[in-house]
Amino acid sequence: SGILNSSFHMTIYFYKVWQPYGCFSNFSLHSIEMDNTFWSTVEHYYQAQKFLGSPDEKIIPVIHQACTPEEAAALGRCSTRQIRSDWEVAKTRIMREAVLKKFSTHSDIKEILLSTGDKLLVEDSPNDYFWGCGANKTGQNHLGQILMSVREELRILSMKAVAN
């Protein structure tokens, strides 16, 4: 819980797409290309990956074609479907790969991410204690941690590009 209790002005909270820093949300309409397939949002891709190699793999094209990220999320969260056996181990890596691709692909939001400097980025989700901070700010904030890691990677890459 200590990481989220640092001084408030050094923290950027994000959650809904239409709010400040909404491009940090996985629901933002920034497409990514992963494994030669275009996905409308990070959320579409992430939810589909839950079923790769599972008995319910047939849901992947349905998630891919979902009209909105909300629909993709609902399809991926359906508790009657069987997700891949390694999901708990793989999900953070998969999310990071998708987030890195999103910010590498779209220079406008890459600049927004880089403009946050060294500020703490926190997904202000009231009901997600893994990806976000949860209602009482004690969540693990894995999405915020991924964004900060991607920000550092992109900063290093942009400094190398300037140096060359």
PLM regions: where:
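N-terminal amphipathic/basic-hydrophobic helices that include classical n-h-c signal peptides
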Residues: S1-H9
